[in-house]
A protein has these predicted regions:
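Short, acidic/polar
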Residues: 82-98, 170-181, 233-242, 321-331
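Active-site groove signature of glycoside hydrolases
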Residues: 146, 171-206, 341
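N-terminal Sec-pathway targeting helices
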Residues: 19-51
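Hydrophobic faces of well-ordered beta-strands that scaffold small-molecule active sites
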Residues: 70-76, 104-106, 139-143, 189-193, ...
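Boundary/entry segment of secreted carbohydrate-active catalytic domains
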Residues: 52-102, 107
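Aromatic-lined substrate-binding rim segments of carbohydrate-active enzymes
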Residues: 89-159, 203-229, 244, 360
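Substrate-binding cleft of secreted/luminal carbohydrate-active enzymes
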Residues: 189, 290-370
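Glycoside hydrolase catalytic-domain groove-lining segments
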Residues: 225-229, 233-306, 355, 359-363
Length: 370
């Protein structure tokens, strides 16, 4: 059955036609073509509307957060400093005194604190708190089984082969001991619970939501005054709407890594800064909770599973040099998130003191002293 459009009949030939009518006519004619044309049209419309909506949410979030002060900090892990041949205390002193860092993300590895079952050694974490407080810095303390740095989960050796019914209550007992020891410290600002919990990367065996909910409730009961941060998945668009709902969401942003599975080359994530602003904005709209950028890549990603100290400086520069660090920091600021913790402070100090390359350290110093 043919369609008849009077506006376009021979009677109207030579007469001026209104633009909306002409567009509608062209659209109808196009729509009458085969199914693949329709699929393409629908796909294009869907993509344009989706990206437009995402971008709009991102711009709203960035604008709504712009009035808040920017807090920049670093993650500091003594065990990692040791692995690079550094003195952890001296490294932390340099971070606080030379870079003038005022926000620290610290760890409380179960394997370090309860190396012997039932016996707690807080000495290493104690001196970190003391140094932070002497410098007037605030602390976000990572707690739980899964914490920053490989192998991601950090159980003591005596708990490795225990069934979950045994190690889980022991884990909670240790976590309560950590909270009780530090909850009255003036420098303690927040807890980060189970870093990147649902990421399967690393040597971990349990990802049950039930355990995460149970731990969250325990932490809030032990210290109701401090906000609890829980990580969302890094570059993925889905919103973490399942329980528990933390006080703040955390996100990690890595811009360049080594693809060991497919291309065996360095891989640059294509997402613009506003994409992460969209993730934070959508999170705020759906849950009412804000997002912090608690892990922004600031160190090289060695190829083929090598460690940093096995990798030449020239190779390290392929994934992180001074120019890229500055660009990454600017990228982090452009997301709109107002709390940013950089990843790699120990690495910057290693490059300066061991490899005699202060370029990254100098970039960080310029940023933290602005």
């Amino acid at each position: 059955m043919s369609h008849h459009f009077p506006l376009f009949s021979s009677k109207n030939k030579g007469k001026p036609q209104r633009l909306p009518a002409k567009l509608w006519y062209q659209f109808v004619r196009y729509w009458q073509r085969n199914i693949w044309h329709k699929v393409v049209v629908c796909l294009v419309v869907f993509v344009v509307l989706s990206v437009g909506t995402m971008y709009g949410i991102a711009r709203w979030y960035i604008a709504s957060e712009a009035h808040k002060p920017l807090t920049m900090g670093v993650t500091f892990i003594p065990d990692y400093a040791k692995s690079l041949g550094l003195d952890p205390a001296k490294t932390m002193d340099a971070v606080l005194d030379e870079l003038h860092v005022k926000h620290l993300r610290l760890v409380s590895y179960w394997s370090d604190i309860e190396n012997d079952k039932g016996s707690y050694d807080f000495s290493q974490l104690d001196w970190q708190f003391q140094k932070a407080e002497a410098a007037g810095a605030k602390i976000s303390l990572s707690i739980g089984l899964r914490q920053p740095r490989w192998p991601e989960c950090h159980p003591p050796q005596w708990a490795v082969n225990e069934p979950k019914s045994v190690w889980q209550p022991q884990l909670e007992t240790y976590m309560k001991a950590v909270i009780e020891r530090y909850k009255n410290r003036p420098s303690l600002e927040s807890y980060q619970l189970e870093n990147e919990y649902f990421n399967t990367f690393g040597e971990c065996t349990d990802y049950s939501r039930e355990r995460l909910v149970q731990e969250f409730n325990m932490v809030k009961q032990a210290d109701p005054a401090r906000p609890v941060i829980i990580s969302r998945s890094n570059n993925y668009g889905g919103l973490p709407l399942g329980k528990p709902t933390p006080d703040l969401f955390g996100i990690s942003v890595y811009r360049r890594s080594w693809d060991a599975n497919v291309t065996r080359r360095y891989f640059e994530y294509p997402f613009p800064a506003w994409y992460y602003g969209f993730l934070a904005g959508a999170q705020k709209l759906t849950t009412g909770k804000d997002t912090v950028l608690h892990e922004l890549q600031g160190e090289a990603w060695p190829p083929n599973g090598q460690s940093i100290d096995q990798t030449s400086l020239a190779e390290q520069n392929k994934s992180m040099d001074a120019r890229r660090l500055k660009q990454t920091i600017d990228f982090g600021k452009a997301t709109g998130m107002r709390t940013i913790d950089l990843w790699g402070a120990e690495y910057w100090y290693y490059r300066m003191s061991t490899l005699h390359d202060p370029s990254l350290w100098n970039v960080a110093k310029q940023e933290f002293t602005k």
